[in-house]
A protein has these predicted regions:
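N-terminal cap/lid segment of alpha/beta-hydrolase-fold proteins
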Residues: 4-34
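The alpha/beta-hydrolase serine catalytic core
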Residues: 25, 88, 135-224, 228-235, ...
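Short, surface-exposed "cap/lid" segments of acyl-processing enzymes
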Residues: 33-77
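Glycine-rich His-Gly loop
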Residues: 43-47, 119, 211
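Short beta-strand immediately N-terminal to the catalytic nucleophile in serine-hydrolase-like folds
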Residues: 115-117, 142
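Gly/Ala-rich beta-loop-alpha elbow adjacent to hydrolase catalytic centers
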Residues: 117-121, 125
């Protein structure tokens, strides 16, 4: 990224914490003028990533620049980034998202909310919608990990990790930061079968973009899920899970922002 872009991002970005209900959620806000915010996009990062991922910085820069009055909030899930929790629990992830949504509404006095979820973040967004309804005008998902349990077992974990879990022991796995995964967390993933849920009520407000070369989560599963729920699905030819190709990432972000504005 050019140095000029970094200057813009540093000027736009502000750190803050949400300290509510026993939670301390580390957040990053992007906006030009906090007093002129009309709408907020909430970003939900993937497994073992964080609010500092450059992909969210790029998304925030584009959204704020192209749609006046837009703010973007990125936050760390439990056990991710700067978060202090040690054990990953699905219900606590739901609580974090609910508190961020409530903060965005009250801080900026707006109900015009949007969501952008990637991989595990996409899974958690859909779980939130299934259990709590949809507080967002539009929801964009990039390579959502619709079967998170299988992604962990088949791709992210080693055979030794799986053996430890089967023996009732937690394991440390991940990328930017290692995340402690317990047998109980894996049981939670099995208990909440996202693929069996229906999202017809929200289908018109959901967009899924998925790379055909995704090496982490199944492209075919995502496509079938979208078809079953009548959700718009955009196949990005040759894109891997993280959209390493800058041109493919740029095109995806432009498509998401256009979707928000439609």
């Amino acid at each position: 990224m050019a140095s000029f872009d970094w200057v813009i991002i540093k000027r736009m970005a502000k750190y803050f914490d949400i300290n509510e209900q026993g939670c301390s959620i580390r957040c990053k806000l992007y906006c030009d003028d906090p007093d002129a915010v009309k709408r907020v996009a909430v970003c939900c990062h993937g497994f073992a990533s964080s609010k500092e991922s450059t992909s969210y910085q790029t998304f925030a820069q584009r959204a704020v620049a192209k749609w006046k009055g837009t703010a973007v909030i990125v936050f760390d899930w439990p056990c991710h980034g700067e978060d202090a929790r040690k054990n990953l629990v699905l219900d606590e992830c739901t609580s974090y998202l609910r508190l961020v949504v409530d903060y965005a509404k009250s801080r900026f006095n707006t109900d015009e909310l949007y969501a952008y979820g990637v991989s595990f973040g996409g899974y958690l967004l859909l779980k939130y919608l299934a259990e709590n309804g949809n507080p967002f005008r539009k929801v964009a998902l990039r390579c959502p990990a619709l079967d998170m349990h299988r992604a962990l077992i088949d791709v992210i974990m080693t055979s030794d990790d799986v053996a430890k879990l089967e023996a009732g022991k937690p394991v440390l796995i991940g990328f930017d930061r290692k995340v402690r995964i317990s047998p109980e967390f894996m049981d939670e993933l099995v208990s909440f079968d996202l693929l069996s849920r229906e999202f017809f009520d929200y289908a018109d407000d959901i967009l899924i973009l998925h790379g055909t070369a995704d090496e982490i989560v199944s492209f075919d599963v995502a496509r079938q899920f979208a078809e079953d729920n009548v959700i718009e699905f955009v196949a990005v030819d040759g894109a891997d899970h993280r959209f390493h190709d800058p041109k493919k990432m740029d095109a995806a972000l432009a498509r998401i922002i256009d979707f928000y504005r439609s």
